A protein has these predicted regions:
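Alpha-helical membrane-targeting segments
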Residues: 23-47, 102-111, 248-270
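Non-catalytic C-terminal accessory region of glycerolipid acyltransferases
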Residues: 2-18, 127-270
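Helix-to-loop junction immediately C-terminal to a conserved catalytic motif
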Residues: 33-73
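Conserved beta-strand termini and adjacent loop/short-helix elements that scaffold enzyme active sites
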Residues: 53-55, 97-99, 115-117, 182, ...
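A conditional alpha-helix N-cap/helix-loop micro-motif detector
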Residues: 48, 120-124, 160
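Catalytic core of membrane glycerolipid acyltransferases/transacylases, capturing the structured
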Residues: 61-121
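Residue-level detector of flexible, active-site-proximal loop/helix-junction positions
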Residues: 57-59, 101-103, 119, 186-188, ...
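Catalytic cores of transferase enzymes with a strong primary signal for eukaryotic protein kinases
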Residues: 11-13, 32, 39-44, 78, ...
Length: 270
């Protein structure tokens, strides 16, 4: 039973019952630069390291098509980690679908656009807008297909149909789309602050228009669950050899002192 104080099946826009005006994404160079600095430093200042596995899987995509990059959504940091991945590692233009964007309007100048789940008509407006943006193969749409925040490693993983709607309409309109799954987790290892773990799954290049939406959604759920389960086992068993350290924070002064003290020779005891 989920704790309703922490998690709810009701989307925030419905829960707060506040009308949200649809906001399109823009790509203002100044605000993109500002957002880069903010997002980069926020992650680097709050995590000991970011480790990434199978980074080169991203290069296996069909570069003639745009990209839908999808991940689990368990906490506030997921969007910031996604921003760092798209901008610093994948080097693409990011677009993010954000509920309650009216509370953070400045993000729209760096690639975010709003979705209002108060009604199906309002939600559809955002989905159609996403399809229009994905004409550009240099764009990556970062999305959380579960559609709502869930507890860490929550099972079963169930997708809402928004992502498959976007993907199938991109296939009809542009001939194809890359679906790139990202397993995302956070864990304390041997330091005082947590580390971020990212595994890039094999891209699914969707070009078939005949697959039913329900069948495609279930296929993507199974594939994504396998990826996330594998990552969870790797972390729990300490099997981290294949993870590349993308960044690692400098040790705080008291940790550096601790390491120096450990190197001091102990006096011999007769």
């Amino acid at each position: 039973m989920l704790d309703n104080k922490l998690y709810s099946d009701i989307p925030p826009t419905k829960l707060r019952n506040v009308k949200e005006v649809f906001t399109e994404a823009s790509n203002d160079p100044f605000w993109v630069w500002m957002c880069d600095q903010y997002m980069f430093r926020m992650v680097e200042n709050n995590f000991h390291a970011l480790r990434i596995k199978n980074k080169n899987n991203f290069e296996k995509r069909n570069k003639n098509y745009a990209n839908i990059i999808y991940a689990p959504h368990s906490n506030w940091w997921d969007g910031q980690v996604g921003y760092n991945l798209c901008r610093r590692i994948f080097n693409i233009k990011i677009r993010m679908m954000i509920e309650e964007l009216n509370r953070f309007p400045i993000l729209s100048k760096a690639g975010a656009f709003s979705i209002n789940k108060q009604s199906a008509q309002e939600s559809m407006k955002a989905l159609k807008y996403a399809v229009e943006m994905l004409e550009d193969p240099e764009i990556g749409l970062w999305i959380f297909p579960q559609g709502i925040i869930r507890p860490p490693n929550y099972r079963p993983i169930e997708f809402q149909t928004g992502m498959t709607y976007i993907a199938q309409n991109c296939v009809k309109k542009y001939g194809g789309i890359n679906l790139i799954p990202i397993a995302l987790n956070y864990a304390f290892l041997r330091e005082s602050i947590p580390e971020v773990f990212v595994e890039v799954g094999e891209p699914i290049v969707l070009e078939d228009t005949s697959v039913a939406r329900k069948d495609l959604t279930e296929r993507l759920e199974r594939h994504f669950t396998q990826l996330c389960d594998r990552q969870m086992i790797d972390i729990y068993t300490g099997n981290l050899r294949e993870y590349e350290v993308f960044f690692q924070a400098k040790l705080p002064w008291w940790k550096r002192l601790e390491h120096r003290l450990k190197r001091i020779d102990k006096p011999k005891i007769d």
